[in-house]
Amino acid sequence: MMIVLVTNGPVPYRIPALNRLAALPGIELHVIFCCRREPNRHWDLPPIEFACTYLRERIIRIGDRYIHNNPDVLPALRRLAPDVVITSGFNPTHLYAFAYAWLHQVPHIVMTDGTYDSERTLSLLHRMVRRLVFARSAAFVWASLGGQKLFASYGIAAARCFRACLCVENTRFAERPGASEPPFDFIFCGRIEPVKNPGFAFDVALATAARLRRKVRILYVGDGSEQARIEERAARHGDAVEASFHGFASQQDLPPLYRSARIFLFPTSWDPWGVVANEACAAGLPVLVSPHAGAANELVVDGENGFVCDLDVQAWAARAELLLSQPGTYAAFSERSLSLVRGFTFDTASDGIMAACRHAAALRRQ
């Protein structure tokens, strides 16, 4: 079976699952990338072990969004003659690929990291496009329960939907024997931009220090436009909070950084999932997360391995105080993080994509 996936660009949390898919007997996987890297992405990538094509980059920027318009996807598809076409978005390039599949009677699969909540504000036109594509697609792949809810909202039967979770290499983040006490109380990992609320994380550290009546330490991993403002605040409140800024970290540097802290703060205003939560859980950290992350109430379960809280500083600080002052509670939450994240693996993700492809191919034979 020749499977062609058309997607924006290579991302570290999907490549290992695609490598596994490509290694399956009887499977030829070819991934068509719209670009080598979107301008706001700074991650490093694991080895790519599948065939791929990089289209000539044609990117339109609208605010923080990047729109891909690559007509050369059509000759690439004609050359590959796929048995199944998967698209992971609704940029013009993805729609060209969908049109190819429909016109050539090739089964089409919709794959999304999006959620019901992340798409609630879409325009009527965007919804109409989705209805058109969904009505002519054979199978659907979701990354989170929010994605499952999204497909259900369009009336798509559960039997046509398959899970391909977002994940990391869990074993890389596991605690090493003989590890010392983590020097940081908190870690914030991600782009230091307003949508991620890094300043809120500092406010939580400050309020927690007041509750514990001691100085707390927070580590920022990442970079962005908000860093200077937080550094200025940290200088003013140095008696209560010690803030350290690591800057951008490569994938290989991340595990010890997570293990250097006790609690992961994830106060995002918008994240369809949030792979940083996988990384934190794999390192055994309890997670405080806003309800605006797709991982909330799925990977991070309120009261089990963390807390899902609205963006209220004192509410977050109260929960942080509980974890930092109750060793038994902390240990239980830490162990539960390790347990929950075991269900999020690259093998599981690969199996979900393969199941969707088999379902789509079976429909073609009918």
Positions of PLM-derived features:
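Conserved donor-binding/catalytic core segment of Leloir-type glycosyltransferases
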Residues: 4, 178-206, 219
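A short, histidine- and acid-enriched strand-loop-helix "catalytic/donor-clamping" loop
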Residues: 106-124, 136-139
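Donor nucleotide-sugar binding/catalytic pocket of nucleotide-sugar-dependent glycosyltransferases
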Residues: 131-175, 181
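Short alpha-helical donor nucleotide-sugar binding micro-motif in glycosyltransferases
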Residues: 248-249, 256-261
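Aromatic "clamp/platform" in nucleotide-sugar-dependent glycosyltransferases that forms part
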Residues: 269
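Short hydrophobic beta-strand element within catalytic cores of glycosyltransferases
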Residues: 286-290, 300
